[in-house]
Amino acid sequence: TVANPLSAMQGQVPGLRITRSSAAPGEEGWGVSIRGSVSKNKVEPLLIIDGVPASGVSEMAQLNADDIETINFLKDASAAIYGAKAAGGVILVTTKRPDAGKTRVEYSGSVTRKIVGLQPRMMSMDEWTDGVLQARLNDGYGEDDNWVRYARLAKAMKGSWINLHGGNNPDEDPIPGGFRGVADFVFHDMNWTDVLWGNATSTQHNLSVSGGSEKSTYRLSLGYLNDQGTLQWGNNSNERYNVRLFNSFKINNRISLETNMSASRQHQVAPTQIGSILGSSIPQPGLPVSTIDGKPYAWGGIHTPNWSAELGGDNKLVVTTMNVNEILKVNILDGLD
């Protein structure tokens, strides 16, 4: 599944640098440079789709990759014909054209599995408690320090929990004074990157009908994309619908008319709290994903980020685009197109 044609070109074209700042579906933050990332005057390339300049390279995200016939890149002298806007180069996109003949129906579909790659290695419970102990003792705190006592308790109770109101309580007063505002303590060895992120699936379906005669040809295409995010909590996806119609009509031997119409509608959903989830520090490894009965867990004023994503609401963005391009071709002299 190719959600954005730019993703298919990464590393495929010499001199073309394509970057992205996020893996969020529909919000990848693509950046394109033809001249190179070290250019003094770095300018975004001019995107031209079927002869019509686009508002920016971001419009590539609205294109159905199955509709694209060719993509060409121009820079320096070859891009000069497009003027000052082409200072960063030109990306020429040509969509598919029909052939005269019998009606042709084509379908393509794909299912892609996203696999989370490199993740930062998080501290284990033992490493975290050792770090807390070393830091506090290095700063001159003694064994009666709240954090020193808490770290030693966490190391001793790793994989278990304490409930001050009963249940599993190894001591009448095991908790340091600075932590007594919390009734329960959990010391699970939790890797929060594995909790928050995981594999995801994307699906794509494309259907086209084309054909015509020597005088008139047509191509109608429909596309559907469902791109799921790797965040395992809350709603995080990009759903896109595409429709494109091309029709050429030969009025006479010298005059022809081309109609190129396209429309897309994109639905993006992301957790409202995703900014704080990504920007906040990962909780200490002892906190659990949920309570014993599967409800959100909080430790004092600390809320685990998975439930912020799950229950914090959604941000929804709907992007609708429509383009109509009419071209009247007049062949004034024989041999000139």
Where are the model-predicted features located?
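N-terminal periplasmic accessory domains that precede
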Residues: 5, 30-36, 87-109, 178-186, ...
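Extracytoplasmic beta-strand/coil segments of soluble accessory domains associated
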Residues: 6-50, 69-70, 79-96
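A beta-strand signature from Gram-negative outer-membrane beta-barrel systems
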Residues: 12-14, 65-106, 202-204, 217, ...
